[in-house]
Regions:
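Fe(II)/2-oxoglutarate oxygenase catalytic core
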Residues: 1-166, 171-175
Length: 175
């Protein structure tokens, strides 16, 4: 059942959009070494080696933020339909107060060769909401022989393909 909850949809974003995001990111003055722990942000190269830029609330990224918001809404909707299909209606995935999404913003992360983000989970609870899904968009394609992939604790590996979105539960079982 573990693998079934990991879902990839190709062409969630266009290749042209992804290229423009990469180009803009490369010149963004707010890029910085990746930090861990949103409650106590710090650089810890034993846990994460990335270059990050948070684009939400940055006026120069407003158009991209809007595209990502719409694509995420569509992706979440399709993912939940997929989950209902594989569960044969056994799971109720909609919260009792209806389908609401809290947009917590978007961060672009660049992994240089040998960069990584160590095993972790993304579940959190804050201000009356819970994060239940994690999503990753791939802005570029990485060949398997080049060693870039997203790997789960059960050994499942997802190969990055430009424009694809990856969705999975944010809980500890999907580190």
């Amino acid at each position: 059942m573990f693998k079934e909850l990991i879902w990839v949809k190709e062409n969630s974003l266009t290749e042209q959009f992804c290229k423009s995001v990469i180009d803009k990111f490369e010149t963004d003055p707010y890029r910085k070494p990746g930090e861990v722990d949103q409650n106590n942000p710090r650089i810890d190269k034993d846990l994460k080696v990335t270059i990050d830029a948070t684009i939400t609330h940055n006026i120069s990224w407003r158009e991209e933020d809007d595209v990502l918001y719409k694509a995420l809404g569509k992706g979440l909707y399709e993912y939940e339909i997929y989950l209902q299909d594989i569960s044969l209606g056994k799971w109720n995935l909609h919260p009792s107060d209806g389908y609401r999404v809290k947009d917590t913003g978007y961060m672009i992360q660049k992994y240089e060769p040998n960069g990584f983000y160590n095993w972790h989970h993304d579940w959190c609870m804050s201000e009356g909401w819970s994060r239940i899904y994690t999503y990753i968009w791939y802005m570029n394609t990485v060949k398997e022989e080049d060693g870039g992939w997203t790997e789960f604790i059960d050994g499942t590996k997802i190969q990055p393909k430009v424009g694809s979105i990856l969705l999975f539960p944010a809980t500890w079982t999907y580190v």
